[in-house]
């Protein structure tokens, strides 16, 4: 069997597994967020934090809850790292420097999981399990809560109430993320991932000498790392490490975990909004982009040029032999079209066009299917933009799900789509203009520029993957990427919740013969076109200086 056929079979199996899980998981999440029942453990949590889960919140109160909880999470994780040397289970590692601690705290709370440190050489068991892994659950639950608040904005009328942030946070964690993660961890242990709290071992090597190996609660952290589209690895090699991702079966399962909730949330959206066809339209747009990018990546990396590529069966530099080009390409596209950022190969070693695909996947806004929660609300923002453009073409006031898209709503949507490009291009320009940041580039020319562009694209889009040629463990990059991660995560949430509040206050508009049907394939095509055109106009000049120039030169 050729590698290409094997890759096609892997992709087919993945699509089948996602299709089987789509309906039951999507409906289950809709029931979770619509339920008025509170389980006893949830009541204990509400009592501990002093929250009333039955109290409805308008968007400013919902936003205050998101920001206050996230700010406390950043502070807690920062302090935990700063005192690591005094904590039990630190494995002898010292406390983390202030700029590194800030960067890591911002990274994990913002669901980015950018790592400019070596996990197995810097973080002990307590920080890994009690700090980083906990934030993997909580940051994902925050994203899901904001997405559900926007869905309620479409579903509700003549009210400004969007639900209760604390109830959404707890339910998303306790009823969705924890149960699936437990199952996922068991599967990964069965596949060969490690799960223990052992210390550092001296292991002999075949070529002579010794090597230090860490134990750790890897399988449990790996499960939520992928399920919550977090991406931060227990080891520096991330999912290329055999302790995290031992074989092709575990590799495909991890990709399944990455895509599971983002795709299923479109079913949740359709169910809560009262029209499953609307969810299918969003799903269709996501699926077209994801499958298209995956096919393009596999074609790019399998393309042979010269005897070395023919012998290797494609561009194998930076890829694990146990995954091959197909397994690496499927993983790379899934991790950059979502906010995961986990890697099982090194994106910096991909072909020029292959690296450009990973960059473009993030620059789309990670909406196909995007991060847990953030993918859905990002796609719904683009859906509003597409409806607005269609309305301009036919001279009608645009509507979406029975809600008028007026000046106020378009301003919120426009601010949302401008924030991330401004952060990415602004920080990249400053870093290239100053002498010190450029010293961190391992490569010069187009690839060196791509390293800088990739770093800020990854940070501002809350992805967390990197072109490994960049030395990001400097005060400049730790600070500026940390700021980009926080602003790129929470500023868009401000406009999402403000938009949700404005929609919830409206009275539904009855559908007429002139209303644009947003539950048809034609609209899905319009949505895909809108996304690609806006992204192209925004980022093409930067991409032309980096991956496109490198790809054409090679």
Curated annotation (Swiss-Prot):
GO MF terms held by the record: P-type potassium transmembrane transporter activity; potassium ion binding
Q: Which UniProt keywords apply?
A: Cell membrane, Ion transport, Membrane, Potassium, Potassium transport, Transmembrane, Transmembrane helix, Transport
Q: Does the keyword Nucleus apply?
A: no
Give the UniProt subcellular location, in the record's own words. Answer: Cell membrane
Give the transmembrane ranges: 1-21, 59-79, 131-151, 174-194, 246-266, 279-299, 323-343, 352-372, 375-395, 412-432, 481-501, 525-545
Q: What GO cellular component is one of the record's annotations? A: plasma membrane
Record membrane topology = Multi-pass membrane protein
In which domain of life is the source organism classified? Bacteria
Which Pfam families would you find in this protein's record?
KdpA
Which PANTHER family does the entry mention? Answer: POTASSIUM-TRANSPORTING ATPASE A CHAIN, POTASSIUM-TRANSPORTING ATPASE POTASSIUM-BINDING SUBUNIT
The family assignment reads: Belongs to the KdpA family.
Q: Which HAMAP family match?
A: KdpA
**Function summary:** Part of the high-affinity ATP-driven potassium transport (or Kdp) system, which catalyzes the hydrolysis of ATP coupled with the electrogenic transport of potassium into the cytoplasm. This subunit binds the extracellular potassium ions and delivers the ions to the membrane domain of KdpB through an intramembrane tunnel.
Q: How does the record describe its quaternary structure? A: The system is composed of three essential subunits: KdpA, KdpB and KdpC.
The name this protein goes by in its record: Potassium-transporting ATPase potassium-binding subunit
Q: What is the lineage of its organism?
A: Bacteria, Bacillati, Actinomycetota, Actinomycetes, Kitasatosporales
* Gene responsible for this protein: kdpA
């Amino acid at each position: 069997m050729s590698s290409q056929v094997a890759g096609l079979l892997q992709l087919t199996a993945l699509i089948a597994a996602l299709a089987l899980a789509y309906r039951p998981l999507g409906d289950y999440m809709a029931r979770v967020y619509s339920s008025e029942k509170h389980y006893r453990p949830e009541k204990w949590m509400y009592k501990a934090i002093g929250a009333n889960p039955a109290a409805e919140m308008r968007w400013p109160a919902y936003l205050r809850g998101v920001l206050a909880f996230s700010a406390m999470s950043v502070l807690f994780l920062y302090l935990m790292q700063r005192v690591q040397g005094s904590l039990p289970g630190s494995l002898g590692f010292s406390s983390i420097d202030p700029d590194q601690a800030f960067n890591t705290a911002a990274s994990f709370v913002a669901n980015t999981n950018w790592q400019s440190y070596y996990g197995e050489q810097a973080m002990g068991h307590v920080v890994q399990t009690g700090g980083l892994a906990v934030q993997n659950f909580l940051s994902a639950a925050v994203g899901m809560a904001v997405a559900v608040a926007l869905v309620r904005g479409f579903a509700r009328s003549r009210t400004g109430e969007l639900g209760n942030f604390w109830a959404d946070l707890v339910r998303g964690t306790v009823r969705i993320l924890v149960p699936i993660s437990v199952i996922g961890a068991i599967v990964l242990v069965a596949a060969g991932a490690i799960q223990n709290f052992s210390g550092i071992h001296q292991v002999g090597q075949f070529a002579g000498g010794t090597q230090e190996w860490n134990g750790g609660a890897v399988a449990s952290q790996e499960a939520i790392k992928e399920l919550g589209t977090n991406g931060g690895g227990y080891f520096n090699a991330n999912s290329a490490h055999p302790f995290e991702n031992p074989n092709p079966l575990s590799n495909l399962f991890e990709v399944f975990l990455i895509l599971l909730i983002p795709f299923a949330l479109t079913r949740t959206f359709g169910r809560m909004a009262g029209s499953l066809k609307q969810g299918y339209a969003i799903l269709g747009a996501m699926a077209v982009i994801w499958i298209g990018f995956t096919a393009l990546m596999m074609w790019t990396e399998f393309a042979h040029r010269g005897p070395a590529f023919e012998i290797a069966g494609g561009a194998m530099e930076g890829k694990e032999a146990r995954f091959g080009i197909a397994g690496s390409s499927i993983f790379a596209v899934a991790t950059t079209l979502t906010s995961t950022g986990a890697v099982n190969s090194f994106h910096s070693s991909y072909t020029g066009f292959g690296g450009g695909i990973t960059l473009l996947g993030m620059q789309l806004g990670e909406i196909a299917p995007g991060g847990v929660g953030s993918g859905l609300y990002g796609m719904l923002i683009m859906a509003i933009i597409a409806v607005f453009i269609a309305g301009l073409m036919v001279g009608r006031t645009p509507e979406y799900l029975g809600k008028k898209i007026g000046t106020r709503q378009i301003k919120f949507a426009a601010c949302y789509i401008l924030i991330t490009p401004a952060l990415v291009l602004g920080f990249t320009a400053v870093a290239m203009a100053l002498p010190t940041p450029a010293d961190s580039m391992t490569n010069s020319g187009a690839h060196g520029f791509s390293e800088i562009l990739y770093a800020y694209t990854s940070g501002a889009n809350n992805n967390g993957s990197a072109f490994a040629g960049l030395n990001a463990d400097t005060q400049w990059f730790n600070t500026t990427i940390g700021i980009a991660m926080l602003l790129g995560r929470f500023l868009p949430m401000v406009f999402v919740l403000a938009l949700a509040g404005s929609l919830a206050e409206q009275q539904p508009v009855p559908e007429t013969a002139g209303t644009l049907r947003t539950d048809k394939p034609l609209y899905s095509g319009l949505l895909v076109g809108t996304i690609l055109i806006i992204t192209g106009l925004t980022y093409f000049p930067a991409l032309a200086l980096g991956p496109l120039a490198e790809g054409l030169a090679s």
